[in-house]
A protein has these predicted regions:
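Active-site and adjacent substrate-binding regions of carbohydrate-active enzymes
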Residues: 1-174
């Protein structure tokens, strides 16, 4: 920060803590054993207090793996003193087949609208803030997923307009 850094992106920050009792999971995935644990909020609050929270000009964004709206609100509500905003991936799972992001199946437009609307309403209601995006290093490109080739130009403009008209901070990639 002394060298002029004005922002930090924390990759999968919501999985930096787990229960110490090491119970067995009740399902094959086990994400509930290490995702969004209460200690994660404690860690981020401490990091905020001791580092980036000392300066109002610092922006922080946390990438959230398999999270919930409730947790994104906690992570990004200024009253909680954790992060400025969060990335979530729920809207990008509308074309997954059996949980596989590289399946290239047609996306569910109605589900996409439902997810975007639900997250927008709930995050605003809870006082949180969202990082808005279509692309990142972990996902196939949005233009290939959500658009037909013959409408590439029009669809690109539509995708850009969509994230710029939602409540949150748009991130542009590729």
């Amino acid at each position: 920060m002394d060298k002029g850094v004005k922002g930090f992106r924390f990759d999968v920050i919501n999985v930096i803590g787990k229960d110490e009792d090491l119970k067995d999971s009740t399902n094959n995935v086990g994400k509930e054993m290490y995702t969004d644990k209460p200690i994660v909020h404690e860690f981020i609050k401490e990091m905020n207090k001791e580092t980036f929270g000392k300066l109002e000009s610092i922006t922080t964004v946390g990438e959230m793996s398999s999270t919930t709206i409730k947790n994104c609100i906690l992570y990004s509500n200024p009253k909680e003193k954790e992060l400025s905003m969060t990335f979530n991936f729920h809207h990008l799972k509308v074309d997954y087949e059996n949980g596989e992001k590289w399946s290239n199946r047609p996306f569910d437009f109605i589900l996409l609208k439902k997810i975007l609307n639900e997250w927008q309403e709930q995050i605003e209601k809870g006082g949180g803030w969202s990082a808005l995006f279509w692309n990142n290093h972990d996902q196939p490109r949005a233009i290939s997923r959500f658009c037909k080739e013959e409408y590439r130009v029009e669809a690109s403009k539509m995708l850009a307009a969509t994230i710029h008209l939602l409540r949150g901070t748009p991130y542009i990639s590729r």
